[in-house]
Amino acid sequence: MGRFAATLVGSLFGLGLLLCGLGRLASAEPRAPPEKIAIVGAGIGGTSSAYYLRKKFGKDVKIDVFEREEIGGRLATLKVQGHDYEAGGSVIHPLNLHMKRFVKELGLSSVPASGGLVGVYNGKSLVFEESSWFIINVIKLVWRYGFQSLRMHMWVEDLLDKFMRIYRYQSHDYAFSSVEKLMYAIGGDDYVRLLNQTLRENLKKAGFSETFLNEMIAPVMKVNFGQSTDLNAFVGAVSMTAADSNLWAVEGGNKVVCSGLLQASNSNLISGSVMSIEKTRTKQTGTPPKMYEVVYKTGSEIHSDFYDIVLVAAPLNRKMSNITFRNFDPPIEEFNDPYQQLVTTLIKGELNSTLFSSRHKDQFGLSAILVTDDSDMFINSLSIVASVSHKEGPPPAVDGMHVWKTFSKDILTKEQISKLFLSYDYAVRKPWLSYPYYNPPQKCPSIILHDRLYYLNGIEFAASCMEMSAIAGYNAALLAYHRWNGNEDMIDQDDLYEKLKTEL
């Protein structure tokens, strides 16, 4: 959720999810496509699944996308004095090729993520300050941490080199029926184990020091996922890719990708809240019956419609979606896994730099401040941000004032804001349930809830970010397509990596 310099974790250059292109059709002869598909949720997962379902099933299927709030879901913006700023998913890695492809095919433009120098604060002083000189940063890191930053680079690179396999599988139209099977196909038991072990446990076994974990790793976890090193090791590795120096965003806000995908898929948007999904009791006839009835509310009116396939692309936590499943035998599992509250606050003000450093404010050059694990600060991070339409990064300060973004667990009080800023003109906040609470061992919710009922957001319990949601959307579309057409040989295949190497 922010741009963090690569030097915070040493030589973490060029890390990311390496993605392949999209590929061939399944070999089995497809039957007639379904008539109607419902997708619940118009975030990146829901709209990307609509996009890929259209590509797989063709032009004749009707796709309804339900959204009770705004298109984009947690890719939301906040307005400060007439300008929009990212409040949710903010940055995209240069090798997130799903997102890059969307931007290219939809005719959108990219902008560099907000840059600047970063510091790490322990509640008393800055334990690390980034320099504009690369060699100075290297000396600082080696002096304080030895070669642990280089070893961290190698650890993350090894994990993500394996993760790239999922994109080769998807480029050949292979799908997976569970998150665990997807993870196993990528890297075997060692990869699945990442979900069941904390990042701290993993890195301590690898020989990383407490000082390095507290000052270099925990701050990145806190700003990206609101937790420390107690989250699972896989989401920890994904989080570390935010140390890349070439992060970008979509001009106009990342949420415009969702509206673009919705339009490109020729889907029908229904602005309403889905109340229940019921398995129908329709008797079998010559044509496949509509298997599910979706009951939804628009304004004060309640409606319903029938669908062949339903994809749920919204968290099924009761505090977030509150969808009731009726007439399923066995019953659909309950989804009680908690999501974390995150409060995004945008403040236009003059930073109280003496809170972090004894230097005069004119000599305080940091644009972002992260906090260590043992800090008693009431925020997770603080950074200067640019509006979604500003191509050149944050504009120069006016009367010493910038627009700053903070992440915190609780709503900031006026006293807390006044502690952070010498003065401020404006503050706007958005509290929301932003991502799962990671508590390994991590069991991911099922993807297949019923014969033609699919759940995308279980992948968030492996890691939550835009690209993971796009991967989940593509996987769900492939899974629905293959199961509709009986292409069992395209689902959960063993030894795919070796098989595809042989094909090449």
UniProtKB/Swiss-Prot annotation:
The keyword Signal applies. The gene is Pcyox1. Coiled coil: none annotated. The keyword Transmembrane does not apply. It is found in: Lysosome. Its EC number is 1.8.3.5. It comes from the Eukaryota. Glycans are attached at residues 196, 322, 352. GO terms for cellular component: lysosome; very-low-density lipoprotein particle. It is an enzyme of class 1 (oxidoreductase). GO terms for molecular function: FAD binding; farnesylcysteine lyase activity; prenylcysteine oxidase activity. Residues 1-28 form the signal peptide. InterPro entries: FAD/NAD-bd_sf, Prenylcys_lyase, Prenylcysteine_Oxase1. This is Prenylcysteine oxidase 1. Its cofactor is FAD. Expressed mainly in cerebrum. Gene3D superfamilies: FAD/NAD(P)-binding domain. It catalyses: an S-polyprenyl-L-cysteine + O2 + H2O = a polyprenal + L-cysteine + H2O2; S-(2E,6E)-farnesyl-L-cysteine + O2 + H2O = (2E,6E)-farnesal + L-cysteine + H2O2; [(2E,6E,10E)-geranylgeranyl]-L-cysteine + O2 + H2O = (2E,6E,10E)-geranylgeranial + L-cysteine + H2O2. Belongs to the prenylcysteine oxidase family. PANTHER family: FARNESYLCYSTEINE LYASE, PRENYLCYSTEINE OXIDASE 1. Keywords: FAD, Flavoprotein, Glycoprotein, Lysosome, Oxidoreductase, Signal. One of its GO terms (biological process) is prenylated protein catabolic process. Prenylcysteine oxidase that cleaves the thioether bond of prenyl-L-cysteines, such as farnesylcysteine and geranylgeranylcysteine. Only active against free prenylcysteines and not prenylcysteine residues within prenylated proteins or peptides. Involved in the final step in the degradation of prenylated proteins, by degrading prenylcysteines after the protein has been degraded.
